[in-house]
């Protein structure tokens, strides 16, 4: 892969900072969008300066200043947006429409990677509210990209390990339970777990690959496609601790929404689609439909196995 110039929008965020690091590591000329107010956030500022020390260029631009966005995207071949679309952090998906307009006006961008990195919104048209809002808004952004004829790649990264592996996919915690574990349904629905650093590696691999132009790239590392019960079994073997398993029927799981915040309801809905309906694995990836799978495209990437990821929690 020859080096290219890359602008990361949202480069101080959870996934964005990893994508910046992967871009730098793979030798790309990397630009990071810096918003005017960042100087008042010491953690974000220090992270940006650490990227600068490693060779990244900081580009000041604002979503409220169209011309500044146009100037920023004119500097690069590839734009990657990693703005948050989860309710419990922030919800900025539709801000990307301003970025689409800037890319359209600039006319030089060879690839745009919008902020997706989760479940494929094109397959979530029947998702329940309020979590469906995320998918609907991502489809609005897709429509704008495609109507503007902007070359693009959609990344469907499935379940981030930090949120779904270390906690054995339990709600309300990020670390493994010590005595009992809630099993969703029978716990045998297949799920896909991906280390966030691997999400970044696969994303950067895709940006100059002609095979991924105007396609959806699914991240399905084969050894990380497993059921929740299989995930629990891996942890039990590593820790030597057998957990009490409590099966939660679908109707009881959905009842957890009652009395919760909108953000919590969205999260519960997403869990339901993943662990009860199997939305991540209940379809075949079909190249004829504009779909590719990352581990097949890039077998050289040594992705982190669930077994190895869990070792940090021992």
UniProtKB/Swiss-Prot annotation:
Keywords, sorted A to Z: NADP, Oxidoreductase
Gene3D superfamilies, per database record: NAD(P)-binding Rossmann-like Domain, UDP-galactose 4-epimerase, domain 1
EC number: 1.23.1.1, 1.23.1.4
Binding site for substrate: 270
Active site per database record: 138
Further facts: Unlike most other PLRs, this enzyme has an opposite enantiospecificity within the two reaction steps.
Alphabetized CDD domains for the sequence: PCBER_SDR_a
Top-rank lineage group of the source organism: Eukaryota
Reactions catalysed according to its record: (+)-lariciresinol + NADP(+) = (+)-pinoresinol + NADPH + H(+); (+)-secoisolariciresinol + NADP(+) = (-)-lariciresinol + NADPH + H(+)
Family classification: Belongs to the NmrA-type oxidoreductase family. Isoflavone reductase subfamily.
High-level lineage: Eukaryota, Viridiplantae, Streptophyta, Embryophyta, Tracheophyta
Function: Reductase involved in the lignan justicidin B biosynthesis. Catalyzes the enantioselective conversion of (+)-pinoresinol into (+)-lariciresinol and of (-)-lariciresinol into (+)-secoisolariciresinol. Low activity with the other enantiomers. Abstracts the 4R-hydride from the NADPH cofactor during catalysis.
Organism whose genome encodes this protein: Linum perenne
GO biological process: (+)-lariciresinol biosynthetic process; (+)-pinoresinol catabolic process; (+)-secoisolariciresinol biosynthetic process; (-)-lariciresinol catabolic process; lignan biosynthetic process
Disulfide bonds: none
InterPro entries referenced in this protein's UniProt entry, alphabetically: NAD(P)-bd_dom_sf, NmrA-like, NmrA-type/Isoflavone_red_sf, PCBER-like
Annotated binding of NADP(+), by residue: 10-16, 35, 44, 142
EC class of the enzyme, as a word: oxidoreductase
Subunit structure: Dimer.
Molecular function, one GO term: pinoresinol reductase activity
The protein's name: Bifunctional pinoresinol-lariciresinol reductase
């Amino acid at each position: 892969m020859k080096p290219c110039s890359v602008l990361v929008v949202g480069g101080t965020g959870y996934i964005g900072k990893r994508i910046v690091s992967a871009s730098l590591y793979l030798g790309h000329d990397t630009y990071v969008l810096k918003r005017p107010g960042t100087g008042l956030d010491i953690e974000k500022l220090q992270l940006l300066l650490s990227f600068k020390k490693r060779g990244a260029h900081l580009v000041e631009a604002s979503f409220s200043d169209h011309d500044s966005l146009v100037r920023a995207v004119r500097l690069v071949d590839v734009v990657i947006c990693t703005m948050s679309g989860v309710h419990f952090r922030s919800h900025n998906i539709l801000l990307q429409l301003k970025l689409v307009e800037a890319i359209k006006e600039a006319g030089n961008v060879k690839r745009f990677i919008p902020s997706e990195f989760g479940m494929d919104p094109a397959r979530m048209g029947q998702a329940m509210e309020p979590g469906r809002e995320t998918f609907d808004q991502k489809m609005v952004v897709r429509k704008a990209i495609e109507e503007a004829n902007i070359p693009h790649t959609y990344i469907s990264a499935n379940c981030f390990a930090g949120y779904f592996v270390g906690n054995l996919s339990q709600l309300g915690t990020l670390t493994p339970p010590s005595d009992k574990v809630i099993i969703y349904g029978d716990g045998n629905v297949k799920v896909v777990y991906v280390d966030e650093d691997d999400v970044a590696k696969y994303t950067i691999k895709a940006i100059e690959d002609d095979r991924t132009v105007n396609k959806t790239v699914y991240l399905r590392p084969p050894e990380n496609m497993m059921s929740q019960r299989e995930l629990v079994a891996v942890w039990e073997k590593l820790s030597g601790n057998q957990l009490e398993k409590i099966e939660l029927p679908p109707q009881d799981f959905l009842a957890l929404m009652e009395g919760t915040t909108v953000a919590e309801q969205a999260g519960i809905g997403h869990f339901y689609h993943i662990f009860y309906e199997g939305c991540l694995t209940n379809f075949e990836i079909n190249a004829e439909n504009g779909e590719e799978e990352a581990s097949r495209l890039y077998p050289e990437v040594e992705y982190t196995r669930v077994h190895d990821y869990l070792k940090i929690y021992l």
